[in-house]
Amino acid sequence: MGRTLESKQQIVEELKQLLGEAEMALVLDYQGLSIKEMSDLRTRLQAANGVCKVTKNTLMRRAIDGDSAWSNLDSLLTGTNAFVLVKGDVGGAVKAVQAFQKDTKKSETKGGLFEGKLLSQDEIKAIGDLPSKEALMAQIAGAINAVATKVAVGINEVPSGLARALKQHAESGEG
């Protein structure tokens, strides 16, 4: 038995809400994945504030209709699709999907959309290779700390150098 019009409208509204909060969308071919494997993917995505929705392409098409931010997603809506919608750690979600695909060897990323731009598989892989937000913040903090240390050493070196020069001059004057 098919879905009623009301349930389809409810699904479209839920998709619109998820898309409104999402920063990135990935489109995966889920053909051949078991329910257990899909549950595993959903669990992996939770840590990165990602959700995986399996829905008909026509319902997703209705959800993105008239939304310029997501309209480019239309070109990926063919075949059996699962949609990964990410509203937080984009890199973490891509890494979770890549780890899942490596473990199962069944799913394939068709493409994605980030900030209105269609992403190829290579661009998605590049996002997954980026360090996490926390790692980047640690690198920046380390760089700032190194600069502050060098400035402090430089400021401290001026009077020390002057003192050494005066001492050397005084010693050479005695001889």
From Swiss-Prot:
Which InterPro entries is this protein grouped with?
Answer: Ribosomal_uL10, Ribosomal_uL10-like_sf, Ribosomal_uL10_bac, Ribosomal_uL10_bac_type
Per its UniProt record, what SUPFAM superfamilies does this chain match? Ribosomal protein L10-like (SSF160369)
Q: Mind listing the GO biological process terms from this record?
A: translation
Q: Does the keyword RNA-binding apply?
A: yes
- Asked whether the UniProt record includes DNA damage among its keywords, one would answer no
Q: Name one GO molecular function term.
A: large ribosomal subunit rRNA binding
Keyword line: Ribonucleoprotein, Ribosomal protein, RNA-binding, rRNA-binding
- What GO cellular component is one of the record's annotations? ribonucleoprotein complex
Quaternary assembly? Part of the ribosomal stalk of the 50S ribosomal subunit. The N-terminus interacts with L11 and the large rRNA to form the base of the stalk. The C-terminus forms an elongated spine to which L12 dimers bind in a sequential fashion forming a multimeric L10(L12)X complex.
Per the record, the similarity remark reads: Belongs to the universal ribosomal protein uL10 family.
What biological function has been recorded for the protein in this entry? Forms part of the ribosomal stalk, playing a central role in the interaction of the ribosome with GTP-bound translation factors.
Q: Which protein are we looking at?
A: Large ribosomal subunit protein uL10
- Which organism was this protein described from? Synechococcus sp. (strain WH7803)
The organism that produces this protein has a lineage beginning with: Bacteria, Bacillati, Cyanobacteriota, Cyanophyceae, Synechococcales
* Gene that produces this protein: rplJ
